[in-house]
Amino acid sequence: MRVSKYLLSTQKETPANAEVISHQLMLRAGMIRRNASGLYSYLPTGLRVLRKVEAIVREEMNKAGAIEILMPMVQPADLWVETGRWDKFGPELLRFKDRHNRDFVLGPTHEEVITDLIRKEVSSYKQLPLNLYQIQTKFRDEVRPRFGVMRSREFLMKDAYSFHLDVDTMNETYEAMYQAYSNILSRMGLAFRPVLADTGSIGGSMSHEFHVLAQSGEDLIAYSTGSDYAANIEKAESPMPTEARGSATEELRLVDTPNAKTIAELVEQFGLDITKTVKTLIVKGATEEAPLVALIVRGDHELNEIKADKLDLVASPLEFAPEALIRDAIGAGPGSLGPVGLNMPIIIDHSVSVMSDFAAGANQDDKHYFGINWERDLPLAQAADIRNVVEGEPTPDGLGTYAMARGIEVGHIFQLGTNYSKSMNATVLDENGKSQVLLMGCYGVGVSRIVAAAIEQNFDDRGIVWPEAIAPFSVGILPMNMHKSHRVTDIAEQLYKDLSAAGIDVLLDDRKERPGVMFADMELIGIPHTVVIGDRNIDAGVFEYKNRRTGEKQDVPFDQIVDFLKNLQA
């Protein structure tokens, strides 16, 4: 490709409304342009990257035995009513009527459509197992689209759906998809971690997320320093206490604490050890008999809302009680709450169950109890894992301790079971002629999100530093003063032809432009390899090669340059 015949829409200035580096660089590198909130057009450079990501995803899915199809983005509302998600999904589901007053949606996902398709097309166990995928545009009407294509309303996604009659083949397909996703991200040259995850709104049992590691990642990943264990912070298991509860050494006493509204203030003002304090949080209960439930974690720990949401006594989705309701039920507000004398179900974290001589709110404004002890001052409450893990704690496999990293979720695989097939009556006849409800798996990759995540992991102060496999071009040719030197022109043109013939994606900057601008554009768009041609190089019979990632420069003889660049791509 010649720059003179290409739309290279680079910008010097960083756009003011771009919050994260990937959004900034995708705009500056001329990859995308905003049409409306959460809606973007891909320019040639951006589309080249997107298509390379898409090609790797497609190759690995095909290699894993999945079959490509294509389903409509517009879906009939009847299918969503059938599964109950018409009412459950919320405002992210964009609904509209056609000219015949029939309800439709713009698909944020395709479980309903694929299940409807399979129940009509598959009738016998002989047709199973089956794994179908598509690479299709999705639309979610995000309340606040952010971060460019990282969280846009319209995005490109690969979604696959597998169908089974038995758990064994469902597990086999799940493992195949796990490996395919690992292959996809490895081939793209990205540092990533597969992590145990919550199944979220889609539902199901087994679930893993695939995270590209980046400091800007929204998700916190807890991983083992001694094994492959990793989990989203929402899912990471807290270790059970190994120590026994200490004996009481203090008397229970009521203390005035007028200026201590938080744990931090309480600890500072009274010189307490934060591990000897607890936080009491009031949430709505699941039953009329227990409309409120108290959740208690140690003062230095954080409540894990996903874990709390799964407790039988707690209403789902988790909802914290408003202050007015708390005051009406307890007589005190947040900041002065505690377990002593509390007349509602109490669930404590396992770490709280072994505490002694601890401090908590007294359920009176501006007062706390110090020296609280279980089974002396109050019965030992029901214990559960309801907190986030902490760095340095032992991991569940016993092979290391927790460390933390931030990640950007780019893939998610689920075992859905019969969540959709049962509600939509998707059945087949088994080998005994009996009707059986299909088991399902669901496997998604954010194709456009990978592009942004790759940038978040690969950039410097000059621009993007693309991994080889997904760079818009592999090689950039920079002829110095091409329009003033016939020698430079002839050699640049010949190198362009030779590299193109060798199957290398090459961009020849044939503009009448200053060298500084040419170098800046090549570095901004992140081309991995640059070849500089000037009269001085020609006199020496060499090209000047520069590696974008390392900054390394070296002279390469004319007759060796093609093989040299091909070997770098191998």
From Swiss-Prot:
Subunit structure: Homodimer.
Catalytic reaction equation(s): tRNA(Pro) + L-proline + ATP = L-prolyl-tRNA(Pro) + AMP + diphosphate
Biological role stated in the UniProt entry: Catalyzes the attachment of proline to tRNA(Pro) in a two-step reaction: proline is first activated by ATP to form Pro-AMP and then transferred to the acceptor end of tRNA(Pro). As ProRS can inadvertently accommodate and process non-cognate amino acids such as alanine and cysteine, to avoid such errors it has two additional distinct editing activities against alanine. One activity is designated as 'pretransfer' editing and involves the tRNA(Pro)-independent hydrolysis of activated Ala-AMP.
Class of the enzyme per the UniProt entry, highest EC level: ligase
Matching InterPro entries: aa-tRNA-synt_IIb, aa-tRNA-synth_II, aa-tRNA-synth_II/BPL/LPL, Anticodon-bd, Anticodon-bd_dom_sf, Pro-tRNA-ligase_IIa, Pro-tRNA-synth_IIa_bac-type, Pro-tRNA-Synthase_IIa_type1
Protein localization: Cytoplasm
NCBIfam families assigned: PRK09194.1, proS_fam_II
Recorded name of the encoding gene: proS
Family, similarity comment: Belongs to the class-II aminoacyl-tRNA synthetase family. ProS type 1 subfamily.
Domain notes: Consists of three domains: the N-terminal catalytic domain, the editing domain and the C-terminal anticodon-binding domain.
Protein name as catalogued: Proline--tRNA ligase
GO biological process, one term: prolyl-tRNA aminoacylation
Claim: Cytoplasm is one of the keywords in the record: yes
Signal peptide feature range: none
Assigned EC number: 6.1.1.15
Lineage: Bacteria, Pseudomonadati, Pseudomonadota, Gammaproteobacteria, Alteromonadales
Any one GO cellular component localisation term in the record: cytosol
Source organism of this protein record: Shewanella sp. (strain MR-7)
Keywords associated with the record: Aminoacyl-tRNA synthetase, ATP-binding, Cytoplasm, Ligase, Nucleotide-binding, Protein biosynthesis
GO molecular-function term, one example from the UniProt record: proline-tRNA ligase activity
